[in-house]
UniProtKB/Swiss-Prot annotation:
The gene is PURA. The lineage of its organism: Eukaryota, Metazoa, Chordata, Craniata, Vertebrata. This is a probable transcription activator that specifically binds the purine-rich single strand of the PUR element located upstream of the MYC gene. May play a role in the initiation of DNA replication and in recombination. PUR repeat I repeats lie at residues 60-125. This is Transcriptional activator protein Pur-alpha. It is found in: Nucleus. GO terms for cellular component: chromosome, telomeric region; cytoplasm; dendrite; glutamatergic synapse; neuronal cell body; nucleus; postsynapse. Its main location: nucleus.
Length: 322
């Protein structure tokens, strides 16, 4: 279900194809190599695994398989010296494979985003078939887009539609750093009909193997409505600390920013500063308008007095002539 344009990647750099995602024990590509896949999602026999004994340092903890249409998806929880992580492998009808790698904290956020996509998909109307055959090859804008950025990895999520139906395209890119080659990328496409089943399988693995931490005590979220927009303020936490996600939502548009807790005070101070400055500017504008109105009234009054004096003088002159 490959598609060409991406709402979440507009303006982004071009991406390479294939490529391994640097966890020990992963295969060297999306083809028939190596020892990275877990459970049923393991790749074919033969080479491509990590050299030496490095592969044995990665332990597989659990694996789930989800069948959607003519595709198989494998979700494997693994663990190595760096911690636990999740590998997602897509195997198409022709045996082609694509893999994504997520830390467990990113997997939690990814699960939450899947919930948003599921809700959005449920609200969409029926798919509209192309009127012309050539329309099948024309790129269509994303129905909904989101993205995650974590360290050197970016995850782009686009709910899209083509002649085969609607699907969620997920692209992961890994920036190897300057001098280490171009950005590498891997992409999977989830048919929209299977999003709930996939999300539930992912949620089960997170519940069973996610890092167990005491839930942080955080303030409840709030929202406010301005004209036809609504702003949501949601406080969350992850391994990087506490943050606030500020979302701007319109009927056909949604955008959000994430503000770390350590800069909340600065953000608040900046908003207050500009609020006070705008009050002063608006007050000056009101005073200026009031002064202009007062001057206009004075000029009008002077004109009226001048006109009255002129009429009076004309009357006196006419009386003297009589």
């Amino acid at each position: 279900m490959a598609d060409r344009d991406s709402g979440s990647e507009q303006g982004g750099a071009a991406l390479g194809s294939g490529g391994s995602l640097g966890h020990p024990g992963s295969g060297s590509g999306s083809g028939g190599g190596g020892g990275g896949g877990g459970g049923g999602g393991g790749s074919g026999g033969g080479g491509g695994g990590a050299p030496g004994g490095l592969q044995h340092e990665t332990q597989e903890l659990a694996s789930k398989r989800v069948d959607i249409q003519n595709k198989r998806f494998y979700l494997d929880v693994k663990q190595n010296a760096k911690g636990r992580f999740l590998k997602i492998a897509e195997v198409g009808a022709g045996g082609n494979k694509s893999r994504l790698t997520l830390s467990m904290s990113v997997a939690v956020e990814f699960r939450d985003y899947l919930g948003d996509f599921i809700e959005h998909y449920a609200q969409l109307g029926p798919s509209q078939p192309p009127d012309l055959a050539q329309a099948q090859d024309e790129p269509r804008r994303a129905l909904k887009s989101e993205f995650l950025v974590r360290e050197n990895r970016k995850y782009y999520m686009d709910l899209k539609e083509n002649q085969r139906g609607r699907f969620l395209r997920i692209r992961q890119t890994v920036n190897r750093g300057p001098g280490l080659g171009s950005t590498q990328g891997q992409t999977i496409a989830l048919p929209a009909q299977g999003l709930i089943e996939f999300r539930d399988a992912l949620a089960k693995l997170i519940d069973d193997y996610g890092v167990e931490e005491e839930p942080a005590e955080l303030p409840e979220g709030t929202s406010l409505t301005v004209d036809n927009k609504r702003f949501f303020f949601d406080v969350g936490s992850n391994k990087y600390g506490v943050f606030m996600r500020v979302s701007e939502v319109k009927p056909t548009y949604r955008n959000s920013i994430t503000v770390p807790y350590k800069v909340w005070a600065k953000f608040g101070h900046t908003f207050c500063k500009y609020s006070e400055e705008m009050k002063k500017i608006q007050e000056k504008q009101r005073e200026k308008r009031a002064a202009c109105e007062q001057l206009h009234q004075q000029q009008q009054q002077q004109q009226e007095e001048t006109a009255a004096a002129t009429l009076l003088l004309q009357g006196e002159e006419e009386g003297e002539e009589d």
